[in-house]
A protein has these predicted regions:
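Intrinsically disordered, low-complexity regulatory regions
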Residues: 1-97
C-alpha cells in the first residue's frame, strides 16, 4: 500500500469516528471556538507524550493510534471553525489564549 492509500485509509477511519462522535455530541466542539479545540489538541498531545514516554495507557481501549486519530479530527474541527471566521482564517486578528 502506498502513502496515498495509507492516508485515505486513515482519513476514512477518522471520518467514521467523527460521524459517530458527532451523532453523540453534535456541534459541541464549536461551543468554545478555535481556542476550545486548541485546548483539546493540547490535551491529546500531552496524552500521546505520556503514552510514549511512560508506556502507560490509563484509558482502556484508547492507545496512541486512537489519540492520533483524535488529533486528526480536532485539527479538522479547528479548520472548520477557521473557515467560518474569515478574520481568523486570514490571520487579521490575534487569538489570545
Amino acid at each position: 500500500m502506498d502513502r496515498v492509500e495509507q492516508l485515505k485509509q486513515i482519513q476514512n477511519e477518522a471520518l467514521e469516528l467523527f460521524i459517530k462522535k458527532n451523532a453523540d455530541y453534535g456541534d459541541a466542539f464549536a461551543k468554545f471556538g478555535v481556542i476550545g479545540v486548541l485546548m483539546r489538541i493540547e490535551d491529546k498531545i500531552q496524552r500521546s507524550l505520556s503514552i510514549t514516554k511512560n508506556g502507560v495507557n490509563l484509558i482502556k481501549d484508547e492507545g496512541l493510534k486512537d489519540t492520533m486519530i483524535d488529533l486528526h479530527n480536532y485539527s479538522a474541527m479547528a479548520m472548520m471553525l477557521l473557515d467560518e471566521n474569515k478574520d481568523i482564517k486570514e490571520c487579521k486578528t490575534k487569538i489570545y489564549l
